[in-house]
Regions:
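A structural signal for short, well-ordered beta-strand segments and their strand-loop junctions
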Residues: 7-8, 43-45, 115-117, 148
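Short, C-terminally biased terminal segments at protein or domain edges
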Residues: 141-155
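Short, well-structured N-terminal submotif of metal-dependent ribonuclease cores
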Residues: 1-44, 53-65, 71, 89-95, ...
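Residues at the C-termini of beta-strands that transition into short coil/loop
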Residues: 46, 77, 150
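C-terminal end-helix/capping segment
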Residues: 124-145
Length: 155
């Protein structure tokens, strides 16, 4: 049986080091344990790496880089950017949050099974999920299921 392909946006590795929200921190850590145990085929994109490299806290940045080191990194292709722009044009994601649109687009273009996020403002939202599915269907793309880590781990 093939492993599920998962895409992690930047919130997931970030929560591994966020002790202010212990339940989410525990779930993010557990997800990374599952990844290390190779229960999933785990991906991030070059957009996630860029966000990590732009972290202001150097110690945190170094920890994040180390954490995602073994994950496969997807290229943010022109097709990904085009689909992200479509989400923005249709007011699904605000322009100032283009990286959020890129995360969703990469998961769609690369036919990922699950996009895992704690971004409740722009990604893990019924309105976003429904609108992304509609646009992807219209344009012939498969939609990744957008979920939180708790949905794929044993809590």
């Amino acid at each position: 049986m093939r492993k599920l392909k998962i895409y992690l946006d930047t919130t997931i590795p970030s929560y591994v080091f966020n002790s202010h929200v212990p339940d989410k921190q525990m779930a993010a850590k557990k997800l990374f344990e599952h990844i290390v145990q190779e229960r999933f085929e785990a991906y991030i994109s070059a957009a996630v790496m860029r966000e990590i490299l732009n972290a202001k806290n150097k110690a945190l940045r170094d920890e994040l880089i180390l954490l995602v080191k073994g994950l496969k990194v997807l290229e943010v292709s022109s097709e990904c950017i085009g689909l992200a722009e479509e989400y923005i044009k249709r007011d699904i994601i605000p322009r100032e949050n283009i990286d959020d649109a890129i995360h969703i687009a990469c998961a769609s273009i690369y036919e990922i099974d699950f996009l895992i996020s704690y971004n409740f403002e722009h990604i893990v939202k019924i309105k976003t999920i429904d609108n992304v599915q509609a646009v992807n269907l219209l344009l012939g793309y498969r939609s990744a299921r957008i979920i939180v880590p708790e949905e794929v781990i044993d809590v």
